[in-house]
């Protein structure tokens, strides 16, 4: 039996985008910082890292599709924060953002990591953006790095 898995180390020549929504920027800025830190710590070249900002989580799938279609990137780390409010808006935005991100990843067969928080309140979001529950932006970039490595291994 053979076990195949990715490594948590970049070769240093991977071009990566961090796609982040600006809405709830107090949270998404921290997620972005965590992702950038992870990229650098694991051998990424800052000159090969682009930060792409969109207004909100609903816009993430469209711009992810454009980034993958461009052929410029080896992978994309998608970050956002959708916080439940008093209306069904949360359900619609989180469902469509999630479906759209997964759809673009499969359409282009490219590594994409999902770091979009979906929380019931601001406290939960803060916990996941660098306090009690770690930084989910850092974790999303870690996932992307492993995916990049695994895809390279499977390519042969």
Swiss-Prot record:
Catalyzed reaction equations: (2S)-2-hydroxy-3-oxobutyl phosphate + 5-amino-6-(D-ribitylamino)uracil = 6,7-dimethyl-8-(1-D-ribityl)lumazine + phosphate + 2 H2O + H(+)
Q: Which InterPro entries match?
A: LS (IPR034964), LS/RS (IPR002180), LS/RS_sf (IPR036467)
What keywords would UniProt list here? Riboflavin biosynthesis, Transferase
Instruction: State where (2S)-2-hydroxy-3-oxobutyl phosphate binds.
Output: 86-87, 128
Q: Which GO terms describe its biological process?
A: riboflavin biosynthetic process
The molecular function terms of the Gene Ontology recorded here are:
6,7-dimethyl-8-ribityllumazine synthase activity
Entry EC no(s): 2.5.1.78
What's a Pfam family this protein contains?
Answer: DMRL_synthase
Which enzyme class, named as a word? transferase
Q: What highest taxon heads this organism's lineage?
A: Bacteria
Please list the coiled coil stretches: none
Q: In which pathway does it act?
A: Cofactor biosynthesis; riboflavin biosynthesis; riboflavin from 2-hydroxy-3-oxobutyl phosphate and 5-amino-6-(D-ribitylamino)uracil: step 1/2
Residues reported in the UniProt entry to bind 5-amino-6-(D-ribitylamino)uracil: 23, 57-59, 81-83, 114
Q: Which residues form the active site?
A: 89
Signal peptide range equals none
Reply yes or no: does the keyword Translocase apply.
no
**Gene Ontology CC:** cytosol; riboflavin synthase complex
Which protein family is it in? Belongs to the DMRL synthase family.
The record's function comment reads: Catalyzes the formation of 6,7-dimethyl-8-ribityllumazine by condensation of 5-amino-6-(D-ribitylamino)uracil with 3,4-dihydroxy-2-butanone 4-phosphate. This is the penultimate step in the biosynthesis of riboflavin.
Q: Which HAMAP family match?
A: Lumazine_synth (MF_00178)
Name by which UniProt lists this protein: 6,7-dimethyl-8-ribityllumazine synthase
Q: Which organism is it from?
A: Helicobacter pylori (strain HPAG1)
């Amino acid at each position: 039996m053979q076990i195949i898995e990715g490594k948590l180390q970049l070769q240093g020549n991977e071009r990566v985008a961090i796609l982040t929504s600006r809405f709830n920027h107090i949270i998404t800025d921290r997620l972005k910082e965590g992702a950038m830190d992870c990229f650098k710590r694991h051998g990424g070249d800052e000159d090969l890292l682009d930060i792409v900002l969109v207004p909100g989580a609903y816009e993430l799938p469209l711009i992810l599709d454009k980034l993958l279609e461009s052929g410029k990137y080896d992978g994309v780390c998608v970050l956002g924060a959708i916080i439940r409010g008093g209306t069904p808006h949360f359900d619609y935005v989180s469902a469509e953002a999630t479906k759209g991100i997964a759809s673009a990843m499969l359409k282009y067969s490219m590594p994409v990591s999902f770091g979009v928080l979906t929380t019931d309140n601001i406290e939960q979001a803060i916990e996941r953006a660098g306090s009690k529950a770690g930084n989910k932006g850092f974790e999303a970039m870690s996932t992307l790095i492993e995916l990049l490595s695994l895809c390279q291994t499977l390519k042969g």
